[in-house]
């Protein structure tokens, strides 16, 4: 669709919304930007150069105020808002900012989705893709809005996009040359309602693929594996736990590729800097993706050896008085935090809690009972988590009134040889703007406690 002179409504004036406006201006669209926050509460609006008549701010609008042919939704905006529902009824198209950025872009596009591991996988693919010498953009749900960046790339470029279920929910004609679905476990059920709806949103990454494209799937995840017969693209499987007849798997301590009856060793686990068996999912998916770019095994293995991981994902803060501190603030659901718990053999003092996303904590507490020496709970979900801990028979837990108190309690519980792990299993939105802010504050508190210069 040519958007020149088309009226387009952008809902949400955060990072994605502002990037969408800039992209739409370049495409010659007639833009209306709406956000329920007042102008004084928003940043970056004046730089857009939109006249007052194109800004509808400070309230949730009626459809007649913002009626448009296309609605571009920011990821955090609920499509159930009445004016959006009326727009759908009136025939307006709904796109995510990702759809706007990538729908007609000529670059080679690699999309990564899944409940957990997206950011690590996306970042690793980006680092490996740069070894091709081609211009490479890493963006999406990873913190850089795609619409802000894509104009600088042509058909020689590579785009590696982390894609959330919110972003994929409203794609229309977006086609990924390589689509990756890492795993699916209950998450964002407050938005999607059911696990089936959540999976359906994730699976849209494959919807417009053709037989010349590649779909990379986790063999070990039954829900993900079951998608394979329904996909048009060539399917490549990976398994972090077994040797597959065809695909990426493990043989002893090695990551290998089984293909056409031949097994090719790729790298030994001991050569990798990423800890935890769950990171094998991320590594195998990344290998499969960059093989589509024609990288040699030597280039891939050197890139894997060099990769140290991503900030706020099992990030080593430091060892102080014999205690190892790990920042896993990106663990925003129980499944992600469970994987972090299995990454360490040392006794663990766990800091958990924050804002729940409508998820149950009882299975998580069963893992905590096996893997955790002491549990410190904080945030609005603390009472719910405490009840689940009691129901599971956990006795060694503490409640903190503030995040700073939680860190001090964890330090007091820990002994030399222990790990103090921040992996909250909840979002940060009750106390912080983002998981990044939470992780930075954790690191600051630890260093301040041990009087290390910040």
From Swiss-Prot:
Metabolic or biological pathway, per its Swiss-Prot or TrEMBL entry: Cell wall biogenesis; peptidoglycan biosynthesis
EC category name: ligase
SUPFAM superfamilies: MurCD N-terminal domain (SSF51984), MurD-like peptide ligases, catalytic domain (SSF53623), MurD-like peptide ligases, peptide-binding domain (SSF53244)
Catalytic activity field: UDP-N-acetyl-alpha-D-muramoyl-L-alanine + D-glutamate + ATP = UDP-N-acetyl-alpha-D-muramoyl-L-alanyl-D-glutamate + ADP + phosphate + H(+)
Alphabetical list of Pfam families matching this protein: Mur_ligase_C, Mur_ligase_M, MurD-like_N
Stored InterPro entries: Mur-like_cat_sf (IPR036565), Mur_ligase_C (IPR004101), Mur_ligase_C_dom_sf (IPR036615), Mur_ligase_cen (IPR013221), MurD (IPR005762)
SS bond list: none
Protein's GO biological process: cell division; cell wall organization; peptidoglycan biosynthetic process; regulation of cell shape
Chief location bin: cytoplasm
Keyword terms of this UniProt record: ATP-binding, Cell cycle, Cell division, Cell shape, Cell wall biogenesis/degradation, Cytoplasm, Ligase, Nucleotide-binding, Peptidoglycan synthesis
UniProt family annotation: Belongs to the MurCDEF family.
Name of the featured protein: UDP-N-acetylmuramoylalanine--D-glutamate ligase
UniProt organism field: Desulfitobacterium hafniense (strain Y51)
Gene: murD
């Amino acid at each position: 669709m040519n958007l020149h002179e088309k009226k387009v409504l952008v809902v949400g004036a955060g990072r994605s919304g502002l990037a969408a406006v800039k992209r739409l201006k370049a495409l010659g669209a007639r833009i209306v930007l709406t956000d329920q926050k007042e102008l004084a509460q928003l940043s970056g609006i004046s730089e857009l150069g939109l006249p007052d008549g194109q800004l509808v701010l400070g309230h949730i609008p009626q459809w007649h105020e913002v009626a448009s042919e296309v609605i571009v939704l920011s990821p955090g905006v609920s499509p159930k808002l009445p004016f959006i529902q009326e727009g759908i009824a009136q025939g307006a198209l709904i796109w995510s900012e990702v759809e706007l950025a990538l729908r007609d872009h000529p670059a080679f596009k690699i999309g990564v989705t899944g409940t957990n591991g997206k950011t690590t996988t996306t970042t690793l693919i980006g680092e490996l893709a740069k070894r091709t010498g081609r211009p490479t953009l890493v963006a999406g749900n990873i913190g850089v809005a795609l619409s802000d960046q894509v104009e600088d790339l042509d058909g020689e470029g590579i785009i590696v996009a982390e894609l959330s279920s919110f972003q994929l929910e409203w794609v229309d004609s977006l086609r990924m040359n390589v689509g990756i679905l890492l795993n699916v476990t209950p998450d964002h059920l407050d938005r999607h309602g059911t696990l089936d709806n959540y999976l359906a949103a994730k699976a849209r990454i494959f919807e417009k693929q053709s037989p010349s494209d590649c779909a990379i799937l986790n063999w070990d995840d039954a829900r993900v594996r079951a998608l394979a017969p329904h996909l048009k693209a060539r399917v490549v499987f990976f398994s972090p736990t077994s040797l597959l007849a065809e695909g990426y798997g493990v043989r002893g301590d090695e990551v290998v590729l089984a293909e056409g009856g031949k097994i090719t060793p790729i790298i030994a686990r001991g050569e990798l800097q990423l800890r935890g068996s769950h990171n094998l999912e991320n590594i195998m998916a990344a290998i499969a993706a960059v093989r589509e770019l024609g990288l040699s095994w030597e280039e891939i293995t050197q890139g894997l050896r060099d990769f140290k991981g991503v900030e706020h994902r099992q990030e080593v803060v430091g060892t102080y008085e014999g205690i190892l501190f790990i920042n896993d603030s990106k663990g925003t659901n129980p499944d992600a935090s469970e994987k972090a718990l299995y990454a360490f053999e040392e006794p663990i003092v766990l800091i958990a809690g924050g804002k729940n996303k409508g998820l149950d904590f009882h299975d998580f507490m069963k893992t905590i009972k096996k893997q955790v020496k002491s549990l410190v709970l904080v945030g609005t979900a603390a009472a719910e988590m405490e009840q689940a801990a009691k129901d599971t028979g956990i006795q060694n837990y503490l409640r903190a009134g503030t995040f700073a108190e939680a860190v001090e309690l964890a330090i007091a519980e820990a002994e030399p040889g222990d790990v103090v792990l921040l992996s909250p299993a909840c979002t940060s939105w009750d106390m912080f703007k983002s998981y990044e802010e939470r992780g930075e504050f954790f690191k600051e508190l630890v260093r301040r406690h041990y009087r290390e210069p910040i």
